């Protein structure tokens, strides 16, 4: 592990040691006293609702050896006591201090750093790339989707004996990725796509493209891997002459182009031609977006000279975070749990996948698209048109804005009697229980904040099912859907159901 000496960085962070020894190493870091471990450094962040300085004593009790604070709330006696086991450092701004120390930490590592951004699929792309890189390197990667001004420095501060870093970068406004890339200093970057996420803040997809391209500002050379199927990235690729671009795609001819694509119920298959050789690939999750994720990971792996056979295995084996096109079969019904995030660009492929399934009704449960501001009506109406275009059998919407989806689906030819619009998850779950049958396919698609897990969980809440036949009775704990399946199989001409 490459360590940072507190004394050496004090001038850079404008730090004043209030107590304790300045000659200490900054190793593990924490911003939460509930999870801090002995020997770590505590950054007492100040937020809207709380000030981490209030928990500094707790951090020291749990073994913190350094605490950064931006307001001295301690008496001389308290500082004297704290200084026996920890060093308390006063800085102008704790968050800025974390950023500056992360920059120092990054400078100590001459390793591959792959940065990923995009409107849709950043986290799943990051997971596949990290899995591919792990075939050759000891990889540190962004945990979850901790991709902001706190998450990026914390990921970098987690570097120990790693020899590669895969880091995700998100943004809500222009200028944010510019700062993140200056912290991480990528050696290679990936842009998964340019869509409409956060368009309410940025005003247009073209402005979103500019904000995502800020990722180049932290690179010595502009080597970037881009999705050539995305209209704005494709256009930029043709116009830009300043950067080295590596392209991937399914529809547009690219350096890495997927061919013979087969989207199956439980994953994808495709062929990739490299130097006149054909290689077969599979992914665990279905849909174009996971093929594009795989292609970006293949491009990264080949850039770092990872053997193609190892890349094949890694792509097939890569685990993707929960609630992103999770396929589950229960009681002979197929559920597509895709409710981590939602945008026009992520909803379209989910609907296309649902449309391609056969047998039973194809039911789409869709919620409000968040963070789109004045573009809300337009984007929800475009989703409604996609629902009708994909011949979805039943549509259930949840939320005020999602009503634009339902109304537009009807305007585009979907039967009105097959569209149900609600404001709560309970209403949606109740209707779903009522209409669902054996063999149906159900897509649950929404942003995480819509809590669509409540709809899914509501289908499998346990009930008591009593069965009486010939004077003999039995009682069973079953889910609502299992109970319904049993009742549907009973011959109603022979038996009475109560």
Predicted features and spans:
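Acidic, Mg2+-coordinating active-site environments of NTP-dependent enzymes
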Residues: 12, 73-78, 82, 190-334, ...
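Glycine- and acidic-residue-enriched helix-capping/strand-helix junction motifs
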Residues: 473-490
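Residue-level signal for inorganic ion chemistry
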Residues: 9, 40, 59, 101, ...
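Active-site beta-alpha connecting loops in nucleotide-dependent enzymes
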Residues: 47-50, 321, 339-417
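Phosphate-binding loop of NTP-binding sites
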Residues: 8-11, 95-228, 233-243, 434, ...
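Non-catalytic positions within long, well-ordered alpha-helices that form the structural scaffold/packing
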Residues: 56-61, 182, 355, 388
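Nucleotide-activated donor-dependent transferases that construct or modify glycoconjugates
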Residues: 40, 464-473
